[in-house]
Swiss-Prot record:
Name assigned to this protein: Cytochrome b
Any further remark recorded for this protein: Heme 1 (or BL or b562) is low-potential and absorbs at about 562 nm, and heme 2 (or BH or b566) is high-potential and absorbs at about 566 nm.
Keyword NADP: no
UniProt key word rRNA processing: no
């Protein structure tokens, strides 16, 4: 059996990636989120496939087909809520995974980090298009507002928006193409995940100290497969609690009203995992400026490796940078809260202050803290 595992052309790749992979001995539970994300992706593809068997991407029947799935299909309600809440868990794991990368300096693996940023954009696009499919009020108006942002692009903006819509408003053509893209993108994400892992295994995993651990590694299986199963059990526990007890906790009640182009909801807002970016978008009174800030709020991750001024890789032994990191985490929570609030005083000013501090911490304070810590260490 060992020989087949190590010599078979296909099994050899699996073996080198998941079984005999040399893994640092010191990695903590924060390294669990990669495997959890893989499981989330597999679950989303599987539940999505079963939903697609019963869903119809037509403006007249989309809302009814989702109702039909919940009422008439065997365990359709379970599949639907697993898919909807699975997306929330996916983003929880994703943000914690990125946070881990920032904290422990994993962004110095440039290829892995950049593929990760592309993955983040792709997952966000997929989630946004998935939110449009039930064709409720928030689906319709969310699609209208977010796609309309592209009209801020000079010269080609309006043409681009109408091209994406497939007409002069969000309608049947938009829903059909969003369904097509929502179906195909997870498979593109899977391909990108393989590339992400390929680049990661070129360098090997980082560890909490940020120091090379080539001389101190153990096989991934059985040590980390067992360790990852604990994280998996906790994630399933959280997911099933959400699905079976509070299935609509993270959703929007407006989405239980069929889409009506003649009636605008009082507060148009995306799902909770986009609220931080939505708050940054809304904090700038100019349309183009807001769109640029929205894109930069994610794209800023790409220049973080260039802003790494410290001689140490990880934040483990850097107290000033640690304080800034947790300040950034708190700031993101404030932005998430503001994104769900109406555009009125005092929320406007809180959002603007939080947006400015978000970029200031990343672009200015973190690099300065790195230089100060170098001085303190007399490096």
């Amino acid at each position: 059996m060992t020989n087949i595992r190590k010599n078979h052309p296909l099994l050899k790749i699996v073996n080198q990636s998941f079984i005999d992979l040399p893994t640092p001995t010191s990695i903590s539970a924060w390294w669990n989120f990669g495997s959890l994300l893989g499981i989330c992706l597999a679950m989303q593809i599987l539940t999505g496939l079963f939903l697609a068997m019963h869903y119809t991407s037509d403006t007249m029947t989309a809302f009814s087909s989702v109702t039909h799935i919940c009422r008439d299909v065997n365990y359709g309600w379970l599949i639907r809520y697993l898919h909807a809440n699975g997306a929330s868990l996916f983003f929880m794991c994703l943000y914690l995974h990125i946070g881990r990368g920032l904290y422990y300096g994993s962004y110095t693996f440039l290829e892995t980090w950049n593929i990760g940023i592309i993955l983040l954009f792709t997952v966000m696009a997929t989630a946004f298009m998935g939110y449009v499919l039930p064709w409720g009020q928030m689906s319709f108006w969310g699609a209208t507002v977010i796609t309309n942002l592209l009209s801020a692009i000079p010269y080609i903006g309006t043409d681009l928006v109408e091209w994406i819509w497939g007409g002069f408003s969000v309608d049947k053509a938009t829903l059909t193409r969003f369904f097509a893209f929502h179906f195909i993108l997870p498979f593109i994400i899977t391909a990108l995940v393989v590339v992400h892992l390929l680049f990661l295994h070129e360098t090997g995993s980082n560890n909490p100290t940020g120091i090379s651990s080539n001389m101190d590694t153990i096989p991934f299986h059985p040590y980390y497969t067992i360790k990852d199963i604990l994280g998996l059990i906790l994630m399933i526990l959280l997911l099933m609690t959400l699905v079976l007890f509070y299935p609509d906790l993270l959703g929007d009640p407006d989405n239980y009203t069929p889409a009506n182009p003649l009636n605008t909801p009082p507060h148009i807002k995306p799902e909770w995992y986009f609220l931080f970016a939505y708050a940054i978008l809304r904090s700038i009174p100019n349309k183009l400026g807001g769109v640029l800030a929205l894109v930069c709020s994610i794209l800023v991750l790409a220049i973080i490796p260039l802003l790494h001024t410290a001689k140490q890789r990880s934040l483990m032994f850097r107290p000033i940078s640690q304080c800034l990191f947790w300040l950034l985490a708190a700031n993101l929570m404030i932005l998430t809260w503001i994104g769900g609030q109406p555009v009125e005083h005092p929320f406007i000013i809180i959002g603007q202050v939080a947006s400015i501090s978000y970029f200031t911490i990343i672009l200015v304070l973190m690099p300065i803290a790195g230089l100060i810590e170098n001085k303190l260490m007399k490096w």
